[in-house]
């Protein structure tokens, strides 16, 4: 039956391996797939592919590697570079889910007659009177719903997140019980195409950007306080690299790449109460003009904070926080929840 055929996206890690095991236990006819997203010489993905292939061999399911390097470069990596050039701090994992991963894998599944796609994300799904809802993973320490805010609402009913109701210890225990070779494999922590975490070196080596473009360091009134080595070295909230010469610590308040300026100020100037969003995506029925009480995550690891969500148009919204938020960073995602349910979110454009 077509509704029992599914693709399982395999990263080579323990979460997707256990997701495959659980889907198989539910009677799904699976095909394992891994997306090759970056040149072999620049990202350590070969071991992950070997691990994914071994998982499929253990489970007795077919496995294939899909080449999406060009699409990934165009839709994710080049946007990553452009965002830094524009003075923003990008979130490539959410962008990849938004523009590439889920839609592409569902399309690949259709070629094989598979209507469902399963992944190892820590998130949950629930059926409601208005359709399928996306919920936070039960293990809030591992919850990955933040990265899924921008996927299409129309595909939720075709997704499965088998480990979303488990915690990490339970996942590893199940992998050990069933003899999966990745039971103790360490989780990946960095951006997949910047495996050493040094984004500055990546911008220099991959994009050929000149990181040494000295400019003025100014305060919020425009007074010149000194000079900086280049805006690409900084992000909002950063203290390191600003030099001394002040009785009070200075922090980056904003970047102005057009004028090659870094705007700095004291700790108290980092706080903002109003955040404007663009490219919004909502996973439930919300309409322009509406206002909703929500909790918001401004970064993946941040705590969800109370705010009022004002919907300005289909693609634009404004958040007014109960308490001012520290170092709100343009280019990052603001993701909105009501209780456990993810409503959606948008990309941070500006603050007040």
From Swiss-Prot:
It catalyses: S-sulfanyl-L-cysteinyl-[protein] + uridine(34) in tRNA + AH2 + ATP = 2-thiouridine(34) in tRNA + L-cysteinyl-[protein] + A + AMP + diphosphate + H(+). One of its GO terms (molecular function) is tRNA binding. Its EC number is 2.8.1.13. GO terms for biological process: tRNA wobble position uridine thiolation. CDD domains: MnmA_TRMU-like. ATP binds at residues 9-16, 35, 120. Residues 142-144, 299-300 are annotated as: Interaction with tRNA. Its main location: cytoplasm. Disulfide bonds join 96-192. InterPro entries: MnmA-like, MnmA-like_C, MnmA-like_central, MnmA-like_central_sf, Rossmann-like_a/b/a_fold. It is found in: Cytoplasm. It comes from the Bacteria. The keyword RNA-binding applies. Pfam families: tRNA_Me_trans, tRNA_Me_trans_C, tRNA_Me_trans_M. The keyword Iron-sulfur does not apply. GO terms for cellular component: cytoplasm. Keywords: ATP-binding, Cytoplasm, Disulfide bond, Nucleotide-binding, RNA-binding, Transferase, tRNA processing, tRNA-binding. Gene3D superfamilies: Adenine nucleotide alpha hydrolases-like domains, HUPs, Translation factors. The record marks 121, 332 as: Interaction with tRNA. Belongs to the MnmA/TRMU family. HAMAP family: tRNA_thiouridyl_MnmA. Catalyzes the 2-thiolation of uridine at the wobble position (U34) of tRNA, leading to the formation of s(2)U34. This is tRNA-specific 2-thiouridylase MnmA. It comes from Acidithiobacillus ferrooxidans (strain ATCC 23270 / DSM 14882 / CIP 104768 / NCIMB 8455).
């Amino acid at each position: 039956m077509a509704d029992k055929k599914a693709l399982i996206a395999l990263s080579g890690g323990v979460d997707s391996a256990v997701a495959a095991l659980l889907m198989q236990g539910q009677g799904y006819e699976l095909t394992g797939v891994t997306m090759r997203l970056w040149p072999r010489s620049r990202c350590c993905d070969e071991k992950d592919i070997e691990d994914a292939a071994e998982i499929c061999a253990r489970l007795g399911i077919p496995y294939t590697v899909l080449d999406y390097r060009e699409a990934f470069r165009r839709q994710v990596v080049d946007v990553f570079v452009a965002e830094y050039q524009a003075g923003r701090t990008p979130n490539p994992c959410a962008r990849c889910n938004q523009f590439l991963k889920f839609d592409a894998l569902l399309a690949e599944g259709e070629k094989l007659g598979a209507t469902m796609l399963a992944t190892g994300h820590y998130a949950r799904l629930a059926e409601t009177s208005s359709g399928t809802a996306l919920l936070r993973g039960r293990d809030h320490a591992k919850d990955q719903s933040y990265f899924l805010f921008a996927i299409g609402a129309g595909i939720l009913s075709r997704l499965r997140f088998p480990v979303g109701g488990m915690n990490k210890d339970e996942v590893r225990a199940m992998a050990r019980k069933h003899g999966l070779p990745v039971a103790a494999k360490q989780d990946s922590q960095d951006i997949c195409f910047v495996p050493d975490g040094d984004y500055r070196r990546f911008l220099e080596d991959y994009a050929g950007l000149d990181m040494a473009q000295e400019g003025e360091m100014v305060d919020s009134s425009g007074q010149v306080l000194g000079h900086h080595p280049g805006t690409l070295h900084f992000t909002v909230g950063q203290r390191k690299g600003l030099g001394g010469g002040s009785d009070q610590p200075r922090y980056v308040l904003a970047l102005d790449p057009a004028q090659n300026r870094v705007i700095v100020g004291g700790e108290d100037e980092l706080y903002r109460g109003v955040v404007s969003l663009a490219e919004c995506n909502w996973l439930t029925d919300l309409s322009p003009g509406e206002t909703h009480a929500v909790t918001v995550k401004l970064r993946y690891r941040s705590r969800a904070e109370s705010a009022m969500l004002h919907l300005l148009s289909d693609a634009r919204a404004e958040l007014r926080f109960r308490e001012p938020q520290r170092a709100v960073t343009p280019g990052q995602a603001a993701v909105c929840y009501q209780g456990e349910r993810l409503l959606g979110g948008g990309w941070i454009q500006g603050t007040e």
